[in-house]
Amino acid sequence: MTTTTNRIAFQGEPGAYSHEACRKARPAMEALPCRTFEDVIDAVRSDQADLAMLPVENSTYGRVADIHHLLPESGLHIIEEAFVRVHISLLAIPGTPLSEVREAMSHTVLLGQCRGFMRRHGILALTGADTAGSAKEVATRGNPSLAALAAPLAGEIYGLERLADGIEDRQNNTTRFLIMSRQPDYSRRSDRMLTSFVFRVRNIPAALYKAMGGFATNGVNMTKLESYMVDGVFTATQFYADVEGHPEDPALQRALDELRYFTSSLDVLGVYPADPLREAQRQAA
């Protein structure tokens, strides 16, 4: 891959968890904030950025809405995954004691992850547009009774004080991100490679059951299989899958060949190494 801008695009304000993921995965690259997921993809396609950082699922709240619809049409390729722990801090105007905070603002998903802390301290929840945007608003208002729930990075960027760290209810809360590029990279090999693809089955009885049979008979582990409607039509279903292995591995090659027989379309989205945290989480489960 030839780098032209040394930028990685993400959705949200500076200080968002996607921004934190960019810093973790590509610390030498400039992070480019974008308003929407579509804008992130367009930034790479239009050469404003080299890579896109997109969240796809959270261990507490499941898959991120709309992402699986965007991936097949993006024209981009998955080259890496990044697991990022969601550490939540209570951020306020510097010098504010915790006892003075009456309300905390954040994205509705993050508010739901800190119910225990909020209840213990009598803090009311206010819904904001996003996590980093809420931190920015708290800094702008300058009201000591108003705080934000966001990543510690947001506090650094907007000059807020961290009154409490690690206030999330679930200490293993993790978001999985995909790093995407204009060009695929099938050259890398390791013991833990992943292949992601989307497919539609042919309109024949038991097509999905038969399509999945090749992975079982060839000993290929499927780590994810999700379905979603296409264009809002109940009868038009597309499937997204992650499997262990490289398409050039004989076992996976045979499984994909069998899958093709029962599908009307099959598109590989990317081949990439598994994040080390994936195995650590599996062993801890």
Language-model regions, residue ranges each:
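Domain-level signature for soluble enzymes in the chorismate/prephenate branch of the shikimate pathway
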Residues: 1-285
